[in-house]
């Protein structure tokens, strides 16, 4: 049961489940710290790579908590566990993946944006889906600088993720939506934040090489294999990701500085 009578420690936290994402974890955590995320509740789904070494600086300073999670498929269960065990520690929790980067294109404080929705138990944040940007193999740069071609605005109701008030949540319905104690809402979320103010850059494919590696793993939400082949996924994303977008690059200089600093403190 969520301990709703306890004071919160953070305004905004992130919950995510991952498997063998070591090459991307430091960038992802460091970026979200820059935009105001204070805590990370991360569920390790039987990784065999160097993820703990990559996360060591953030674990050491108390920013990241790693939970071993050998549950299959595990994503929805991890989200429910996070709400029950850590919901009292944060006013808002964003439930996103390691290939998703939350930020404000209008350069507003995310905490201030969310304060406008304090009367709601959750909000939906739209995706901007990025493709390979022509990369056949993993490029040497960071994720946010390597991929700059995205799709147009979200085309259907599943192109979003949720940021919730844990006290208003009953359970996760899947990777995108939750059921809420107050059921007086039509649709998957109580309200969507405008795309121009808050969004998630979703680097789903990355390079062709990385996409092929990704599709070899089972889905975190169902445990099933990914439906599209790599060729089919690349064909779809290449055709649909033609909008140049570098709004997130305003964070690049600060992100590089942060990564340089944490590299020296890695265990």
Where are these predicted regions, by residue range?
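A conserved acidic beta->alpha catalytic loop
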Residues: 44-60, 71
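Short beta-strand-to-loop acidic/aromatic patch adjacent to the donor-nucleotide binding site
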Residues: 90-103
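N-proximal low-complexity "stem/linker" segments adjacent to membrane-targeting elements
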Residues: 1-30
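Active-site nucleotide-sugar/metal-binding loop of Leloir-type enzymes
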Residues: 80-92
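Short acidic/polar active-site loop segments enriched in Thr and Asp
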Residues: 38, 91, 121
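Catalytic-site signature of metal-activated, phosphate-bearing donor transferases
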Residues: 1, 77-80, 104-267
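A short, glycine-/small-residue-rich helix N-cap motif at loop->alpha-helix starts
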Residues: 23, 71-77
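Short, acidic, metal-binding catalytic loop of nucleotide-sugar glycosyltransferases
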Residues: 30-39
